[in-house]
Amino acid sequence: YISEVGGPRQGNVEGVRKLFNRVVKAAEGAAKGTETKMVFEVMHGNYPLMPNETLSVLIDEELKKLGGISYTDEENLFAQELYKTLLNPDSVIGDQQSVQPLVLTQSKGSTDVGDVSWKVPTSGVRIATWVPGTSAHSWQAVAAGGTTIGTKGSTLAAKVLANSAVKLYFCLLYTSDAADEWL
């Protein structure tokens, strides 16, 4: 008896359905070829995040007001040591100090926030909580995230989202524009 939990990822709902059906057919074929039985159960699924330009621009404006993350001397030493362990980093220490230009893309990652975004206008923010160049799901991400570097990033994210929420509350134009775009 073998159990596997996983799921196909694709940039859109129809793509996930098609890919899922192919995975099922491949598993059925493998079961026939090995004279075994294949059964499956869909336990959950996540829709891709539906981007909302109105909210993304609002959040980006609030992030630009607050700026990036500066390291203390101690944090910089830690970051440099951690940076030495990274494989093919795509950015350098210091990049966390500036806010990157807003690029509107559709995330292909799996998240329950994607499900929410199909019910209400949704957006979020990505903040440097790791040493620049760190790969997600790595020990380096965990190591940096548990330090003041991670705390600074989390705090900045909270401030950006809170300031954005206040702006939404007091300026109904953003709310109506986000809803119009979503519909």
Where are these regions (language model features)?
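Long, hydrophobic, amphipathic alpha-helical segments used as structural scaffolds
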Residues: 34, 169-172
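Zn-dependent metallopeptidase/amidohydrolase metal-coordination segment
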Residues: 76-158, 176
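Short glycine/serine- and small hydrophobic-enriched flexible loop segments
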Residues: 162-167
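Short, compositionally biased segments
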Residues: 8-9, 171-173
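Single conserved hydrophobic/aromatic residue that forms the stacking wall/gate
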Residues: 174-183
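Secondary-structure boundary/capping signal
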Residues: 35-38, 124, 183
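Divalent metal-coordination and catalytic microenvironments
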Residues: 59, 116, 161
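Midchain, well-structured core segments that form catalytic/ion-binding scaffolds
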Residues: 1-71, 81-83
